[in-house]
Amino acid sequence: MHFEIVTPIIEIETIASGSTIRILALLRKQYGGGHWRKLKGAATVRLDDGTIRLAELHWFEAHGIGKRKMRIKRFLD
């Protein structure tokens, strides 16, 4: 599902970091080494069909690499 983030991400929490990330080997292979963390937060998103919803987002992030593999986990509204 493609989406666009409309508002800044709020309530950001770290879910996992380092070796506790299940796909750590894949992240390092695709994007390079770094201190990878899995994070979650909430933001208003615009979906492909134009609807705007509040969603919980999950993504991976490493210093110097940025946010990768962002996805909608669930809708909060």
Predicted feature descriptions by range:
Residues 1-77:
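Cysteine-centric segments in proteins
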